[in-house]
Amino acid sequence: MQITPAQSSDRESWNIFVKNNYPPVGVFMQTWEWGEFKKDWGKKIERFFVTDGDQLIAVFMLAEHSLPFGFSYGYLPRGPVLAKTLDQQKINAVFSFIRDWAIQKHSHLVFLRLEPPVQEEVVAELGKKHFLRPDYYIQPRYNLTLDLTKPEEEILASFHSSTRSNLNRAERRGVTVTLKNHQQDVSQSDFWQMTKDTISRNSGKNLYPPRTYFNSMFKVLPALGNETSPDQLSIGTFCGHQHDKPAATHYVLFFGDTATYIYGASATECLKSKVTTYLHWQAAREAKARGFKYYDLGGIDEKLWPSITTFKRQFGGLEFAYVGLIDIPLQPRLYKLYNFLKKLRHLGKS
């Protein structure tokens, strides 16, 4: 096996491999465009091919995250991406090879953090080979996704009766949805005003990234257009209005077979219009019309987000579960210190 850096000329082949070999949920995080966005936001990003002879068997994007005292660690968001043709033995060999490579080539990192989009049984034996499994996770381990390959009437029939009722209520109360181009005619001022309402309803807890994050994302990612290719990550801005008044905004990423809801905000005074339910449905319909197979409503977790989880589950759909984090200590003593300090910070907040 061999690991080689990807070059700028490899964008198309990179995205095609990711599209063809990734499960429905989380695919956008290993696209070329997502890496470019993270670069613009200030992250150090590297991309690598894993080959076996003349066969491409895996790819991964490596993002460096700073730690105190000048140290850092490497994070593979929802990666590495493995070829679907690999059997269990070959998958184990790929993980072991990445570990050996990281020890040799990235010794400046304290540890390497993997987040493979695979099921638990695929990595069940990794703990025997110096891989560690943190008891927390970064990306949601569970996502809820609508199957858009079914007829629209069948998708609607799978919704909870209250969800179908809310869709009808939204139309009766004058809710409309427009897909807009963020690079042309969308002002973020409405979105940021509505985030204040959303944060207030969440007991003041802010789950939004800083504005610089959104600025870089909108700067780098192309807007969803009529000729947008599924081989290129793009973003759709779905604006909901009630009687021409801004009521909610959803941002949805499009790539491969999946449209992925990532962020949204809504005006408190318009919540009774059920605009957020209506926005999800119209975004899913847009994705289906464009030939996408899945609409990912995002993470669910009964303990962390009980109300959001209940809301999303009323859409029916498919639930996907992934293994979470796998750490490879490159400097074991510093890795132990990192975990010790992390636990202290957690105790200090509790």
What are the roles of these predicted feature ranges?
Residues 6-53, 60-69, 128-137, 150-151, ...:
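A conserved beta-strand-loop-helix scaffold within acyl/acetyltransferase catalytic domains
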Residues 93-100, 213-336:
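Aromatic (often tryptophan-rich) hydrophobic motifs at membrane interfaces
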Residues 43-45, 106-109, 290-292:
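Short, high-confidence coil segments that cap the C-terminus of an alpha-helix
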Residues 77-87, 149, 264-273, 301:
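A short, internal acetyl-CoA/4′-phosphopantetheine-binding micro-motif in the GNAT/acyltransferase core
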Residues 7-11, 64, 128-153, 289-350:
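Active-site/acyl-donor-binding loops of N-acyltransferases
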Residues 72-85, 106-111:
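Glycine-/proline-rich flexible loop or hinge segments
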Residues 77, 112-115, 262, 298:
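A cross-family glycoside hydrolase active-site/sugar-binding cleft signature
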Residues 90-176:
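Acyl-donor-binding surface of acyltransferase catalytic domains
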